[in-house]
């Protein structure tokens, strides 16, 4: 209702009465029913909740607390607050015991918020000697790099494609979502893995499935490095304007009676999203006079599906071409971090410590970022030497 991205929500809260309107949308219209459902499932009443832990992005932290979020999107891109302690449920009319402690995971910068500090907590980057990279895939792609000695963070505007947004048949990773794809190189026929019970027909395609289908289309030479269709077959169709698409499921094969396909426009949107991630990784590492060869762990988080085919993510140039054993998909890390904070004072102290010690890099003011981004808007990249395994294929 108020936009799928934080910028639209900030604009909305800037209108007369907007701050209160969005705060009510979060607390009363969203969280209160969720808490009610959780209490019903657990067989308890809300007054038995004595601690609440929240891990959300910087903008949502501001909107939740009824604080002006405009500084998030305006130069010099400094949030109104970074850390807020001492809250209790009655301060927010939160659906819990009035004296329940409300813990907000702290912000690092305008686009690296409490969801990332909570995620960094669970990744254990801070407890390792080795250099690790933490990547959270969402509308903003957030990165944390470092080890027990230091940590640096940044964010890039990847858009909603990783979560199925701005994709013609995209959806979140719920029942009916195509989450994995393999394409036969000769017949061009797809084999689909679908979220849900056995026999579930496809409804749409989620982030992990989009990664797979683009990687497979490229591997089988159905699309070019620019994401354009260059092979013909019964699974490839074109509209009246000549725009190509690959048909994953015909009307008869889908749950909804609607064709499920991925178009050249979809592919272009996703290429831009993956380019944002890869270029951010390059900029962050190069700012430290390092490159991807120093990486010993790569943790990937986000609601993109039950898992990511890391080989395919590298094939399209989304992640660096390093040993695949370094990658680990850790799922919803911000939720895991909030859970840890709810259960442990030590976790609360640690997440505050991480936030205080983490350096934030603002990519939007980096003069090299756009050049790196444009170079990454190909499959896998304009510099093929960065992807030796793709060259070997």
Over which residues does each language-model region extend?
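Glycine-rich phosphate-binding loop of actin/hexokinase-like ATP-binding domains
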Residues: 1-5, 71-84, 118, 124-209, ...
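N-terminal glycine/serine-rich phosphate-binding loop of ATP-dependent small-molecule kinases
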Residues: 1-63, 71-73, 103
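Glycine-rich phosphate-binding loop and adjoining helix at the ATP-binding site
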Residues: 3, 9, 63-118, 162-166
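Phosphate/ATP-binding catalytic cores across multiple sugar-kinase/actin-like superfamilies
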Residues: 29-42, 116-119, 271-293
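Short glycine/threonine-rich loop-to-helix capping motif typified by GTGT followed
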Residues: 57-71, 242, 290-293, 302-321, ...
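Acidic, glycine/GT-rich loop-and beta-edge segments that sit at the periphery of enzyme/chaperone cores
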Residues: 101-116, 340-393
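Catalytic phosphate/nucleotide-handling subdomain of diverse soluble enzymes
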Residues: 147-152, 156, 290-354
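A contiguous, well-structured pocket-lining segment that forms one wall/lid of small-molecule binding clefts
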Residues: 218-288
């Amino acid at each position: 209702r108020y936009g799928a991205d934080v910028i639209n929500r900030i604009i909305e809260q800037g209108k007369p009465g907007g701050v209160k309107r969005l705060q009510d949308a979060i607390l009363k219209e969203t969280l209160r029913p969720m808490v009610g459902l959780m209490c019903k499932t657990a067989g308890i009443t809300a007054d038995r909740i004595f601690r609440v832990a929240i891990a959300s992005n910087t903008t949502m932290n501001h909107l939740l607390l009824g604080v002006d979020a405009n500084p998030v999107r305006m130069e010099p891109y400094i949030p109104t607050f970074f850390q807020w302690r001492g809250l209790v449920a009655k301060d927010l009319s939160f659906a819990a015991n009035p004296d329940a402690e409300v813990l907000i995971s702290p912000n690092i910068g305008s686009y690296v918020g409490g969801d990332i500090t909570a995620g960094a907590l669970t990744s254990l980057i801070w407890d390792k000697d080795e250099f690790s990279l933490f990547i959270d895939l969402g509308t903003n792609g957030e990165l944390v790099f470092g080890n027990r000695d230091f940590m640096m963070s940044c964010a890039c505007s990847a858009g909603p494609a990783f979560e199925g947004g701005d994709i013609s048949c995209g959806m979140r990773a719920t029942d009916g979502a195509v989450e994995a794809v393999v394409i036969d190189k000769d017949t061009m026929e797809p084999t689909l893995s679908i979220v849900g019970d056995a026999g579930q027909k496809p409804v749409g395609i989620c982030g992990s499935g989009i990664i797979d289908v683009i990687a497979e289309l490229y591997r089988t030479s159905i699309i070019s490095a620019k994401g354009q269709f260059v092979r013909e077959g019964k699974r490839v169709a074109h509209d009246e304007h000549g725009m190509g698409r690959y048909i994953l499921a015909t009307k008869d094969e889908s749950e909804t009676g609607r064709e499920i396909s991925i178009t050249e426009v979809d592919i272009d949107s996703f290429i831009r999203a993956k380019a944002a991630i890869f270029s951010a990784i390059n900029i962050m590492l190069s700012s430290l006079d390092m490159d991807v060869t120093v990486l010993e762990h790569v943790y990937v988080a986000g609601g993109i599906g039950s898992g990511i085919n890391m080989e395919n993510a590298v094939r399209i140039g989304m992640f660096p071409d390093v040993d695949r054993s370094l990658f680990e998909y850790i799922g919803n890390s911000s939720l895991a971090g909030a859970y840890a904070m709810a259960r442990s004072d030590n976790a609360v102290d640690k997440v505050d410590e991480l936030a205080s010690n983490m350096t934030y890099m603002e990519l939007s003011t980096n003069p090299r970022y756009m050049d790196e981004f444009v170079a990454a808007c190909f499959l896998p990249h304009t510099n093929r030497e960065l992807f030796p395994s793709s060259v070997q294929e």
